[in-house]
């Protein structure tokens, strides 16, 4: 069981963009933390585009990892992000969902629930692993390897601004939106 960190790392305390609460935010497994450079990625999306860290340079964005399309928790999480997407877009912050499902499954899932953001395919879990979002987890009392529901707010400088891992779905998208608002306010006041 991962330990909870009572205070954000020193780099995080300098920025109002950090969203840390005992209930929702814990350090990611394998050490990815606030202030760390985000691992590079380049993945295909169900929108026919490739999405990469380099292509998003200079923009703040949400990257969330979820276990599987069309499952109850993943559907709730995706729909919660969908419902907050207008506010996120207003803040200039795109959302990208990532799982190991193929593009056909993603397109079906996105269409069925009218998700306005792309879903990226990471079939070998290499990107999830780089973010600490793949590893051993418990499901129905059994240990297994899989995607650990995790979300990262990546700043315009390519550094991690906030981490939620493992995610509790209820209230999560709202917590992410609040972190985005705080980050935007911090950016506006420091300019």
Describe the role of every protein-language-model region.
Residues 1-191:
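Chalcogenol-based redox active-site neighborhoods
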